[in-house]
């Protein structure tokens, strides 16, 4: 038997559409809803569904665990209300599966996020080849109930999906990639920042708590680091290119060589500056070309569509911003952990 837990906060989203699709495939359906609208209650009654419903916000981890308690299936898929299942694939052959997600995008920030979701897919696919997993995307995924219970269920944290994915990887479970779902992303930059504050702090919380275990298993984090944060490639390449200590020293000394002709000193300084600029540009554009060609080829092979013209914006602006947010989040979580302060995200219940 297979169970599907459809998760909602207030609004129904695609719940009824998913109910119809999954019931036709023989799934037991369970609604896990906090502060449900009348529409969610109507859908639950109409189809005679099992449900765990709370008038107050429990926190997603608690809502999921409550649903697992009443699920009878050996395999469970979890689907957020803003996500629509298109196909599932052979998810039962794995201990857990990442369901491939695409974004039905209209705004610029959504279209850029769709490229990011392709990177998520690539990360999960490469990780599965190494029999590893660093995180799951909670919008849609599946897991064997026995595996979930053995791991102790969902834990109380900001990113319960990331934390569960890491535990799967650390304990050697087989995590596959299959199926397809359409999900939503923030349509405005302001909403994107709100989401990314939660994602980055939640991810940093998991990383800091398990740092040593992660570092000891490079196959867990190397695919994630370079595929999910591709702008790091340029940074690494920049470090590997020749960088003359002599030129650095000369650029510091030249301004004080007032006994040399003023114009000659200025031209020498300009030359050194331009050499550094050229060096950095070579690193940036070489890494971009390598990354862009790679994702274009892989997108064709996997039939995943996104706008190629947005790749430069994604690589040089969107992803570096996301990377910086993650770095700041790591610093904040580390300080809070050292000082014993509780980490909270505004508008999010744990």
Regions found by a protein language model. Name each.
Residues 62-63, 79, 85, 93-150, ...:
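Long helical/loop segments within the catalytic core of UDP-sugar-dependent glycosyltransferases
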Residues 96-121, 156-160, 165-223, 257-259:
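Catalytic donor/gating beta->alpha subdomain of glycosyltransferases that bind UDP-sugars
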Residues 15-17, 37-45, 87-88:
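Acidic helix N-cap motif at the loop->helix transition within catalytic regions
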Residues 31, 214-218, 252-350:
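Juxtamembrane C-terminal module of membrane proteins
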């Amino acid at each position: 038997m297979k169970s599907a837990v459809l998760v909602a906060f207030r609004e129904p989203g695609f719940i009824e559409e998913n109910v119809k699709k999954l019931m036709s495939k023989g799934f037991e359906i369970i609604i896990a809803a906090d502060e449900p609208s009348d529409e969610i209650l109507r859908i639950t009654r109409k189809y005679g569904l099992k449900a765990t419903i709370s008038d107050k916000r429990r926190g997603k981890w608690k809502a999921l665990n409550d649903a697992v308690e009443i699920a009878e299936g050996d395999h469970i898929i979890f689907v957020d209300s803003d996500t629509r299942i298109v196909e599932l694939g052979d998810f039962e052959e794995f201990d857990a599966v990442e369901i491939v997600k695409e974004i039905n995008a209209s705004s610029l920030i959504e279209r850029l996020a769709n490229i990011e979701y392709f990177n998520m897919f690539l990360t999960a696919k490469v990780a599965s080849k190494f029999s590893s997993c660093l995180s799951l995307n909670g919008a849609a995924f599946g897991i064997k109930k026995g595996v979930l219970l053995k791991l102790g269920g969902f834990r109380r944290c900001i990113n319960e999906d990331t934390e569960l994915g890491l535990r799967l990887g650390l304990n050697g479970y087989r995590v596959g990639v299959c199926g397809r779902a359409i999900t939503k992303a923030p349509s405005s930059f302001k909403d994107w920042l709100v989401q990314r504050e939660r994602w980055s702090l939640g991810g940093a919380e998991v990383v800091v708590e398990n740092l040593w275990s992660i570092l000891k298993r490079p196959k867990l984090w190397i695919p994630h680091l370079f595929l999910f944060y591709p702008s790091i490639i340029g940074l690494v390449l920049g470090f590997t290119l020749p960088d003359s200590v002599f030129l650095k020293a000369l650029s510091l000394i030249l301004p004080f060589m007032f006994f040399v002709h003023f114009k000659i000193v200025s031209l020498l300084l300009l030359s050194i500056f331009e050499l550094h600029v050229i060096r950095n540009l070579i690193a940036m554009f070489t890494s971009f070309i390598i990354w862009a060609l790679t994702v274009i080829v892989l997108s064709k092979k996997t039939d995943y569509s996104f706008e190629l013209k947005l790749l430069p914006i994604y690589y040089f602006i969107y992803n570096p911003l996301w990377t910086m947010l993650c770095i700041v989040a790591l610093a904040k979580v580390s300080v809070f952990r050292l000082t014993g302060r509780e980490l909270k995200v505004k508008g999010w219940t744990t």
